[in-house]
Amino acid sequence: GYAAKNVSASTTTTTDNGQNKPSVGTGIYLIKSSAETVEMNPSYISSKKTDRTAQFLVSGLIDADIRVILNENKATLETSNLPKFQFVFDTLKNNNENQWFGKNSTPKNFFLVKLKTTKKTRELIIGTTSALQDQIEIKEKQKIPLKNKKIGPGVYEVSPISPLEPGEYGIVFSNAIWDTNSGKIYDFSLKK
């Protein structure tokens, strides 16, 4: 699998009300300080696996977790325990090709989740499978509550409601397609 992990600084402009606004396109930006905003480039899912051990050992009626895997056990981008993000959506171009950041999208279409680390990778449980069906959904208990404030047309400041523990995190789209061709997670690390 391929992990896109380039972090590039973006330029910012100041709006009339003193808020920083990226002068670049749609996406998610980490606000490092009042003077520095960094574009977050997603990591792409390298594989997907299902742990069917319990199903085989005990019963086919037991659900098995479906996980997506990111290469490397740590994100390139590091931040503090109460990170602030800027979400920029396309409000002008009527961009319907980009379901993530199109004109009908809002921060409520995204979830913040903690990723499980292994020696070589990071994982996210995206659902369960049973003998009868697959159920793809990120459970409520996995989602970290976010607050958001609109600061301009299609521009929102987003942050966790409570400080985060050290570890690996990701921002995911609620209707993501979890495959190795297009599945992506906007990942970051909190220092220990």
Predicted regions and their residues:
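Periplasmic N-terminal soluble interaction domains immediately after the signal peptide in Gram-negative
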Residues: 1-4, 169
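Extended, solvent-exposed segments with strong compositional bias
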Residues: 124-153
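Primarily secretory-pathway and cell-envelope proteins
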Residues: 3-130, 174-192
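Aromatic- and Gly/Pro-enriched, solvent-exposed loop/edge beta-strand patches characteristic
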Residues: 153-157, 176
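A structural micro-motif recognizing beta-strand termini
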Residues: 159-161
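A glycine-anchored, Pro-Gly-centered beta-turn/N-cap motif
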Residues: 154, 163-168, 172
